[in-house]
């Protein structure tokens, strides 16, 4: 069922698809799913959705005093799992599915702290730059600025580039985990039965300590088709072909809050 969801990209052979869930109002709700590369100890992408069940802000971020802060992912059953390296080679533990993306329940937020959801990110990139794009997506998908007015469902895929050597900056976690050279997002909006999409491609570097404006973030916009060309990942492939081909050509930042 996870592989047939709209947010789930096409997978690469040899990798492991993991999904985390919580019980919300008596129903099982997916926090996110991911494609984990067991050789590189890093996820190729994480995917999730904002909808009526998942857009609420009900709980705070997991308490940093709760140890381990970044536990091994129990869904890997210890196979090719990577334990946290506290030093992380000076990089931040960058959430792929952000903690602030999943605040609708305690379990859902805790699920975002597994090591499979972590990527080594430069501090200023994580805390000052990427976070602005994350905030925009949260505004579009959650119960805040736009509420449910922007999308009935907003599908999100995030990741860092780990497949090709020329898209890897280096290695962290005792040289076992690649540091992506680029990070990306692919978004699919469904509103009143109509589909639209946009994507973002961002070089992983230190952009300084001043948070960028949305006009600056807009410079990172690309179409989903362009992002597929950059990453080799087939996004939103579970859409009907005629819909997929149309929406994946789109890149209109003005209709996405920019």
Predicted segments with their positions:
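Domain-level detector for secreted/extracellular nuclease and nuclease-toxin modules, and
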Residues: 1-258
């Amino acid at each position: 069922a996870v592989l047939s969801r709209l947010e789930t990209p096409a997978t690469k052979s040899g990798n492991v698809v993991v999904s985390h869930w919580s019980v919300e109002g008596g129903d099982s709700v997916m926090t996110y799913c991911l494609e984990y590369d067991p050789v590189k100890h890093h996820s190729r992408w994480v995917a999730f959705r904002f909808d009526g069940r998942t857009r609420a802000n009900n709980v705070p971020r997991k308490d940093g005093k709760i140890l381990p802060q970044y536990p091994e992912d129990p869904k890997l059953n210890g196979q090719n799992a990577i334990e946290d390296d506290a030093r992380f080679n000076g990089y931040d533990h960058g959430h792929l599915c952000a903690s602030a993306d999943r605040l609708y329940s305690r379990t859902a937020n805790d699920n975002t702290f597994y090591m499979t959801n972590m990527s080594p990110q430069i501090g200023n990139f994580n805390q000052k730059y990427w976070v602005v794009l994350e905030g925009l997506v949260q505004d579009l998908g959650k119960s805040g600025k736009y509420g449910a007015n922007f999308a009935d469902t907003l599908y999100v895929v995030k990741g860092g580039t780990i497949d090709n050597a020329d898209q890897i900056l280096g290695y962290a976690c005792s040289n076992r985990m690649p540091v992506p050279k680029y990070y990306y997002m692919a978004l699919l909006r469904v509103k009143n039965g109509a589909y639209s999409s946009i994507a973002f491609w961002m070089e992983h570097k230190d952009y300084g300590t001043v948070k960028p404006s949305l006009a600056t973030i807009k410079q990172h916009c690309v179409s989903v088709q362009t992002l597929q060309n950059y990453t080799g990942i087939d996004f939103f492939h579970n859409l009907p072909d005629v819909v997929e081909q149309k929406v994946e050509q789109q890149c209109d930042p003005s209709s996405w809050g920019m």
